[in-house]
Amino acid sequence: MFNQIRLLKVKNILTSQSFRLIDFLVYIFYTIFGKNQINLYIFRENMTDNQWKIFCDFKNDLKKMVTKWQEQFPNLKDLQKQAAIIAKTPDYPFETPIVYNLALEEISKNDEIKLIVIGDNPGKDEQLAKNNKYLVGQAGKIAEGFFNRNENLGIDFRKNVIILNKTPIHSAKTSQLKTIAKSGGEKISELIKESKIWMAKRTAQLHIELNQQTSDENKTELWLVGYSELKDKGLFLHYRDELKKSYFIDEISKLEWQNVLVFQHFSMNRFTIDLKNYMEKNCTNCEIDRKILRELGKIHRNEIFGD
């Protein structure tokens, strides 16, 4: 028999304006045949009107800021080229110095946002005019493959995930942002700092506001992937400090800090290797599930944020 949670879920499905028979059948299938427990994330839910407005306001604000920064600093591309030459980066076309993630425009009200994933900054593939999307290079393919292999998580990496960065400013390698800041002088250095602080504050606001409109079992998690530069004296120290501060402005926001998780980056399989090592040490014959991911994400969060 269905327990109370299941009955409520079925009622919500049947009364939803977006009810589709196939969604209901998928939900029933996983309820009956699931190995251990119902994965409530498997069912697709639309964003509420309020969530859709919150998301649209965010992407419009980000688009405006990217446009503003691009207009204010037309010489940024030259500095990026110079930093790449100094680092002996193989030649590539420099097309978009500050990247707005066009994948945000592909998210519709009919999509459920299950994750906000935060990378470092747009790399060579991301800044190409034909892309202008985050995590489309090798790291993105690894991330997409991870979720495809672990279908029990119920997450489509290209449909259920808002992908953002700690700064939208491009560099071939993240470390080259230091060279760009040094070569560009005080104004460019302040631009990079401003972009990190803005992204941290506005991303936290997005996360908190989305979850205020969401039931406990469907809370959106925020994953910080790649944390070496979040450590003391790291390149993203301003981002780290501003992000945490944004979650501790009041008691309601503070609750969502528990849904902020930190992981190794997807690049070079560091995420999957770290997860595998953790599972080998802490559980035998267990599957990758949300519980395991939260455990590991909290461990790394404590390493970086000290809580």
For the regions a protein language model found, what residue spans apply to each?
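Extreme N-terminal basic, low-complexity initiation segments
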Residues: 2-4
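Polybasic, lysine-rich low-complexity intrinsically disordered segments
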Residues: 9-12, 36
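Active-site and ligand/interface coordination hotspots across diverse enzymes
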Residues: 14, 25-32, 39-138, 299-307
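Serine residues within intrinsically disordered or low-complexity segments
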Residues: 16-18
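Glycine/proline-rich loop-helix segments at beta-alpha junctions forming the active-site rim
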Residues: 49, 176-307
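Short amphipathic alpha-helices and their capping/turn segments at secondary-structure boundaries
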Residues: 96-109, 142-155, 210
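Short loop/turn segments at strand-loop or loop-helix junctions that form parts
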Residues: 115-123, 163-174, 225-228, 263-267
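Short, surface-exposed acidic-centric catalytic microdomains
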Residues: 146-181
